[in-house]
């Protein structure tokens, strides 16, 4: 029969091995997720600085503003699920998400101005604006501050 001390050492060893395997798998998953997100990213030079965004489709411009926990990829995925063809989906990464830096003034009004600057950079005069979850605040600010740029406002 093995002693209590030997059993505890074996248990700790097994826990350490299992933890190492979990960490290794987690690191692989994070690397794969970062690679997948960076593949579709574009950077637009705008009047307020470089902004990351993704774009898909053609037709009526639709600006899809993501919520918390995402980036342009979340905006693209949710908008694509909501609408069929016939839309040019433009999805920015909000301040502090993925490849868009946090400016000195990260307010919803400043974010709205950044959305308008992105539309300028992409030569889009007017767009349907979809604000998803936490993205709704800057979507509302965009409609309030740049109403001539918003053909419809949808909040989810």
Report each predicted region and the residues it spans.
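An N-terminal hydrophobic leader/cap segment in hydrolases
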Residues: 4-43
């Amino acid at each position: 029969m093995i002693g209590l001390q030997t059993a505890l050492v074996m248990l700790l060893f097994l826990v350490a091995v299992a933890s190492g395997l979990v960490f290794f798998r987690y690191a692989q998953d994070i690397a794969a997720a970062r690679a997948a997100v960076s593949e579709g990213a574009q950077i637009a030079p705008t009047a307020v600085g470089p902004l990351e965004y993704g774009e898909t489709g053609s037709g009526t411009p639709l600006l899809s503003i993501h919520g918390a926990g995402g980036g342009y990829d979340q905006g693209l995925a949710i908008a694509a699920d909501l609408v069929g063809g016939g839309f040019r989906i433009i999805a920015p990464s909000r301040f502090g998400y993925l490849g868009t830096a946090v400016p000195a003034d990260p307010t919803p009004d400043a974010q709205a101005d950044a959305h308008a600057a992105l539309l300028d950079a992409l030569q889009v005069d007017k767009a349907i604006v979809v604000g998803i979850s936490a993205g709704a605040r800057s979507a509302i600010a965009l409609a309030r501050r740049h109403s001539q740029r918003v053909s419809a406002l949808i909040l989810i």
